[in-house]
């Protein structure tokens, strides 16, 4: 049940500060258009059409990484999505930014510079600390209201996400509203029939958290091929990381007792891959039965065809299906079989379905599916996991105060 104010509670024509999550892939310095712009455009366009003066906050990448770039390209992409001019200023709360904010007229949209270029944005600290930063105090006085639409970043206690609701009127944008409602449904909704969850990705802690918290709700957990630590607990020596970083070894060492205990307690609810795919000496996709893996010597990058044949009817016969993360390295078409196949099976059903994780919407777009074939497609990653496990989302909590 939502307990925060939404755009329906906001009087038209005010000057508003809107936090979006436009964090995007960057290839050779070029920001890639993606579904996040589609989603957030709904909020921004509604506000502009209602005569609000709109200033946008967003982040991109992390300091020191190749994707840590300015938001000037984001402003251009957003303009295409809302079909109106969007201005950009290369400051977040400096004198030029304040000047441009003061010059906003009804229906104008201004994108401020990358929040993570501000010293006050990082690291994560209590909301009360972030509310007292120069960043928050400077901008708060320039606006009538703050709107958080960045559900996918709601697990982060950063200044632009948690500071403003403590010092000014705060509202949820349309993405925040719909994502929160859909992603909490699994914990609140009751089902009479089979409930299935497809769990992918490479983070053992995410797999553990999801399965531990949802074991009474979910009848069958189907595991993706690169969640390699769980097959290891079942006695199959799978998995080097694709960059030879021994990701599985490190995660196994840190979480082996929890994984073994989880597998022992919930073995009848867990369906493991029966075959896995790897790159052979000719750079082609090859598959191997899990039972035939007797030593750890390969990087397995996807579930195999037999696994997909086993998983698909389980999905299609379910009353509800939830998906989290990838089944394989779908960016490489050779290893897209698992991720694309699972998503196609979910799309083919009429059941209640929610799919999410940081890469899911990208996979849907890459392989020609439409979001309306699913009950809900979450653009969130970490926040989606936390919602499924009923963990605190600090960005939502401050809106509810």
Swiss-Prot record:
Belongs to the phosphoglycerate kinase family. The keyword NAD does not apply. Substrate binds at residues 21-23, 36, 59-62, 116, 156. The lineage of its organism: Archaea, Methanobacteriati, Methanobacteriota, Stenosarchaea group, Halobacteria. Its main location: cytoplasm. This is Phosphoglycerate kinase. It comes from the Archaea. One of its GO terms (molecular function) is ATP binding. ATP binds at residues 331, 357-360. Its EC number is 2.7.2.3. GO terms for cellular component: cytosol. It catalyses: (2R)-3-phosphoglycerate + ATP = (2R)-3-phospho-glyceroyl phosphate + ADP. It holds the Pfam family PGK. It is found in: Cytoplasm.
């Amino acid at each position: 049940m939502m307990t925060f104010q939404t755009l329906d509670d906001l009087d038209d024509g005010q000057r508003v500060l809107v936090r979006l999550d436009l964090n995007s892939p960057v290839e050779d310095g070029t920001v890639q258009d993606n579904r996040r712009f589609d989603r957030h455009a709904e909020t921004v366009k509604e506000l502009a059409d209602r005569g609000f003066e709109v200033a946008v906050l967003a982040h991109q990448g992390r300091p020191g990484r190749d994707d840590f770039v300015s938001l000037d390209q984001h402003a251009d992409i957003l303009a295409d999505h809302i079909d109106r001019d969007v201005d950009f200023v290369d400051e977040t709360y400096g004198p030029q930014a304040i000047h441009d904010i003061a010059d906003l007229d009804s229906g104008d949209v201004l994108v401020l510079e990358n929040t993570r270029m501000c010293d006050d944005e990082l690291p994560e600290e209590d909301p009360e600390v972030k509310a007292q930063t120069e960043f928050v105090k400077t901008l708060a006085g320039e606006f009538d209201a703050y709107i958080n639409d960045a559900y996918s970043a709601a697990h982060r206690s950063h200044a632009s996400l948690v500071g403003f609701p403590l010092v000014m009127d705060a509202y949820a944008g349309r993405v925040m509203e719909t994502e929160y409602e859909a992603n909490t449904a699994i914990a609140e909704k009751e089902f009479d029939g089979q409930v299935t969850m497809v769990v992918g990705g490479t983070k053992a802690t995410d797999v553990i958290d999801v399965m531990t918290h949802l074991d009474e709700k979910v009848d069958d957990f189907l595991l993706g091929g690169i969640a390699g630590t769980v097959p290891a607990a079942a006695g199959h020596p799978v998995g080097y990381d694709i960059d030879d970083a021994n990701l599985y070894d490190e995660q196994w060492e840190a979480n082996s007792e929890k994984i073994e205990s989880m597998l022992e307690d919930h073995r009848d609810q867990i369906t493991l891959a029966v075959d896995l795919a790897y790159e052979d000496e000719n750079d082609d996709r090859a598959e191997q039965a899990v039972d035939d893996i007797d030593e750890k010597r390969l990087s397995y990058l996807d579930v195999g065809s037999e696994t997909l044949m086993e998983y698909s009817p389980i999905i299609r016969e379910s009353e509800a299906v939830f998906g989290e993360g990838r089944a394989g390295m779908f960016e490489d078409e050779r290893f897209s079989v698992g991720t694309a196949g699972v998503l196609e099976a979910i799309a083919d059903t009429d059941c209640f379905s929610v799919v999410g994780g940081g890469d899911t919407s990208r996979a849907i777009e890459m392989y020609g599916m439409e979001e309306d074939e699913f009950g809900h497609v979450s653009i969130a990653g970490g926040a989606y996991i936390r919602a499924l496990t009923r963990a605190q989302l600090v960005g939502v909590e401050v809106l509810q105060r």
